[in-house]
Amino acid sequence: MRKFILLFIILIAAGSSSAQKLHFNVKGLSDTTIFLAKYLGPKLYYADTVLSKNGSLEFDGSKHPRGLYAVVIPGVKYFEFVHDNEDVDMTVGDVNDMVGSMKVDKSKNNKSFYEYILFMTEMKKKSQKMNQEYTKLSGDAKDKKLEEIRAVGKEIMSGQMEIYKANKDLFIGTMVRMSMDVDLPEPPKDKDGNITDSNFVYNYYIEHFWDDIPLKDDAIVRTPVYHNKLDKFFSQQGLIQIPDTITKYAKKLVDQMDYGNEDNQVFQYTVHHITQKYESSKIMGMDRVFVFMADNWYCGDNNHAWWMSEENSTKLCERADKIRNTMIGEYSPMLILPDSTEEKWINSYKVEADYTVLYFWDPNCGHCKKTTPKLQVLYDKKFKERNIEIFSVGKATGSDFEDWKKYIKENELTFINVGLTQSVYNQAMEDPRPLLQKTTLQSLNYTDTYDIYSTPRIFILDKDKKIKFKQLSIGQLEEILDDLTGHHDDVKLYPKEDPENGATDPDDDHGDHDGHDH
């Protein structure tokens, strides 16, 4: 008897797990192919197809993981629904107004989902109208309208909280909770009404940003909501944009995820998103975040990136190692290279200056030909008298050697000019050991040491040869060194606004690439 009851329970459980019919009726729809699309972050990907008949169509929900989905009909129209391992039965009354005509016949998630959509649509219209009115007002009327706008904001948060609390055990509840902003309390004040902690609001916002978000539930990455929340947290709307702050909270966030468990989708999505964001960031110094992510979740004993091939993982770690050499705040790798006579070897660390401009260039690079003469003008008119030196490393192998020497002479470059000359290069290729009495391997391999895959590249080093700034345009270089040396108000010889003095970022189209892999 006990065996029979146990078997009966198992059969019921098996039946309930397979009974996930996703059924839809679309009035007026011709018999055609219909697509099921699933979200991964903000993007939709095709997941299944069925043929509709008399406007009726059905997918097998047991084949698809929980998340937010879309039914795509011809004419590139679609409507969304929540899949949370329950039967779904929905009817679209008008293909030209699918949200407004939607009737949810079966599915607790989707009844609340469409109530939420209609609520937010109404609130958005109300808010937009008030904002338009606000821009046309002034004085007391403007202040009053601002209070009304804030009241609408509170109404939105109140409505969201009501829907969330009513659906805590459903996935729609999770989606709504992720959409909500942090409800900020008033900061502490003294008896005179003065705020006693100016950082209270920011700290509270950051510390409570992820409250009630199930970071071990893979379904959250199959909505655009988690992606948007993640993006906001790591933007200026969230964290202070300082590398050490970002790495601190990246680790705090990821450590809440079960990354020892392979196939953890939230961990994969989060780590990949943060890593990619800061690897490609054009904000100076943010490459430190990329290196931090590589060290903590991709490389060596910390390699938890189960989704990456060994080859791609190795490439990422090699990239991190290259960047590591030139991170802002680190000591610059020492360079000892010969001048154009090939007789005098100059050590970058023996350059006595308050600031050193480290400049990598190529005599045949178009952008370098514009930048280098400007650098000489700055050296003559500003840098020399302020104890700022330029340590210039030119491309001097092969035919570039004569071009390099010719360019130095014709343009009367009086700052330090060194390069890896052809004879030194040949000797290094044959047997570098004799050269190591004069120089170092990192000097002979300076393009790898400093990750020079395009030119020109400009760094600013302090008196201790620590990297303070990098990837600068000529206009940025002038402005920064004016500021650092107390000449903020000096007339700019090369204003940043002039496109000719634009960025030398290696990811833009100005720099000339030398064939090194990214």
Where in the sequence are the language-model features?
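Bacterial Sec-dependent N-terminal signal peptides
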Residues: 1-25, 470, 488, 516-518
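A non-transmembrane, solvent-exposed segment enriched in polar/low-complexity residues
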Residues: 20-168, 175-212
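Thiol/disulfide oxidoreductase modules built on the thioredoxin-like
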Residues: 179, 427-483
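Structural microenvironment flanking redox-active thiols in thiol-disulfide oxidoreductases
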Residues: 370-411, 419-429, 442-445
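N-terminal "domain-start" segment that seeds a small globular fold
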Residues: 309-348, 423, 480-482, 486-489, ...
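Long amphipathic alpha-helical scaffold segments
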Residues: 271-280, 286-337
